Amino acid sequence: MLKQLSRSLGIRSSPIVANLIRSKQVCTRGFHISLVKQNTSSKVNEITDITSDSLKVKEDAAGSDLPSTKTDKKSKSESFQPVKFEDFKGKGYIHDSIINSLHKNDFKELTPIQQKSLVPIFNTEKGLVCRAKTGTGKTLAFAVPTLQYAYKNRGKGVSTVVLVPTRDLAFQIEEEYRKLISHLKYNERPNLELIIGGQRTSFNPRRPAEIVIATPGRLEKELQTDRKLAKCFSNVTYRIYDEADRLLDVGFESVLNEIDGLLYKVRTTPKPIKSLLFSATVDEAISEFSKKHIHPEYEFLNTVTKDDLEIPENIHQQLIECTDGIDKVNVSLSELHGIMKQHNDYKVIVFLPTKTAVDWFYEYITNALDDELFELFSKPPRVFMLHGGRSVRQRSAALKGFKVAKKGILISTDVAARGIDVKDVTNVMQMFPSVEIADYIHKVGRTGRAGKKGKASLFATPAELPYVSLLKRKRKVKFQEVIQSEKLNSSNIIDQIESPLDSTKEFLATMVGYLQQLQSAHRLDYDSLVIENMELYRKLVRDDKAMLESRILSRIGKGISAHVKRRYFTRTRYQSHDDAEFDSYSDFSRSGMSQRPRSNDRSSKMTFNGRGKYGNNRNNDWSYQNKNRYNNNNNRQTERSYDSDRKSHNDWKYEKKFEHRRIRDHDE
């Protein structure tokens, strides 16, 4: 009896075994089957081909109406076109508990992108690439299907990974998920976890979250270093690339390739990961990336029609042509003053290009408000700042404060240009051109959300007008209003506000590098840009002959004409700042650019040698080693330490002691 049973089992299984041996896409180890390359072929597994062949034989023989999965899903999705979330009830797509949660969050009507993408996301087998404009509800388009899967598969490890370019976007997506999860029964709630840079990961491998939102760099590190955590990703079903164009722009492609390999390395199921990619633009780079990470024959869904404008009509775009950099700051301050004076409730986002620019403008505005230089008829606004140099806690607090404020001004770098969904933003002000032309569109998209009216202002000097021409030619941007600054009754506010010397210097020093990026990106006149901004610097510090140290030009000032260098840059070291402050003028990390390379020796510190240059002394701390030595009060030291020729043993000992004290005081 047993012999006959084993013989029959061997006969029945032999075709499957033979097919497995012939297959190049599967490898066998014991009774475990796993795919080596999940997304490189439309035939995911030849076992499924055997099953479909057997079904086809049965259909031909018996004339039955067994469904062909692919066509049935397609016809089903074509016949079912939901308009409201209620339409999903009884259709088997979304659980009633999640639909009720959507209603409690006031999500009732589907946005156009949700109408077009929700059902295809549920039905897709090859993965989906979706072109969608910002602010159209795409987050909910992937949040609902992934939450539905996590709801049905609680306690089975990570089922969804959402990859985003910035921490701020991660917080925004987390908030959307939390809204939906909070209205589910406590024992039915899927777990949610953030794995992002700048904060400690609280992921618990014993009770892994079903949904993980991550920035690429941090997720790669965790998957490489924590085996227990990596095992929790063995059954990932959905992988979301949100703001994919931004992910590639900032150079995350190699990291995403590594993450892809790490996920498939720990994978225990033969099924491929369903990858969904969302992007405002789909160019050749996105297409090649999608073929590699989604599927060679990925499904493409375009929710942006030819008639759709990149910037909605409810946003009033205004171009203010300024005479120079000084006029630009003056007019922008007058514009802010007008908003504060004329409106009871308002939210304004002011975009600046570098971290030091944000620091300076924040201090500049708060000083003006504290001194009551703006004539206001009501309570002054709350002012917040946001940039990559702030901690996660500070950035989160700034965003939350700005969201709840009735009157608020957010001063930010490009980190707030994408993925930040703040309701009721009335005005967006861009004071400088963006390196990426698409960033203009994203910044403008922070206002006029959910169909409400908004106003976007761009301030441009004569040297920056070619950038405006590029916007019109490449992105079909149409300004409803073009104003010359001379026609505005702007008061001379810039003379009434005292600009902090240190932050002003840092702002203008790092701007030199940013202006070079603009020149190379848009072919602007570098000399004219530098002259405009250096004249602004002199106006702010109230010194008609103020100059910046030419040392900052060693890496970021190439291309400036000799006469401009002589006019605005000097080799003389200003004595009004100590060494650490002087160094910070060229600290690119504060401006959002790459950091200055350091020596491989961790103990090495930069030193200023006797020739007036900076060397790499591996043992000394940052110190000024010229003949003239200055203490913290910027006065010359006593003759004991100022002797430029011979010094006794006691003199050197005294100087060493003084140097340590100076460094210690600076660190404190």
UniProtKB/Swiss-Prot annotation:
Known EC number: 3.6.4.13
Catalytic activity: ATP + H2O = ADP + phosphate + H(+)
Main localisation: mitochondrion
Region (Disordered): 585-668
Enzyme class, first EC level, given as a word: hydrolase
Transit peptide interval: 1-38
Motif annotated as Q motif, chain positions: 87-115
Gene Ontology, cellular component aspect: mitochondrial matrix; mitochondrion
InterPro entries on file: DEAD/DEAH_box_helicase_dom, Helicase_ATP-bd, Helicase_C-like, P-loop_NTPase
Database matches in PROSITE patterns: HELICASE_ATP_BIND_1, HELICASE_CTER, Q_MOTIF
Annotated Low complexity bias: 609-636
Residue numbers binding ATP: 132-139
Domain Helicase C-terminal residues, every copy: 332-501
Sample GO molecular function, one term: ATP hydrolysis activity
Domain Helicase ATP-binding: 119-300
Alphabetically ordered keywords of this record: ATP-binding, Helicase, Hydrolase, Mitochondrion, mRNA processing, mRNA splicing, Nucleotide-binding, RNA-binding, Transit peptide, Translation regulation
GO terms under biological process: mRNA processing; regulation of translation; RNA splicing
Locus of motif DEAD box: 242-245
Family matches, as Gene3D superfamilies: P-loop containing nucleotide triphosphate hydrolases
SUPFAM superfamilies: P-loop containing nucleoside triphosphate hydrolases (SSF52540)
Function in brief: ATP-dependent RNA helicase required for mitochondrial splicing of group I and II introns. Also required for efficient mitochondrial translation.
Domain notes for this protein: The Q motif is unique to and characteristic of the DEAD box family of RNA helicases and controls ATP binding and hydrolysis.
PANTHER family noted in UniProt: RNA HELICASE
Family the entry assigns: Belongs to the DEAD box helicase family. DDX18/HAS1 subfamily.
Name under which the protein is recorded: ATP-dependent RNA helicase MSS116, mitochondrial
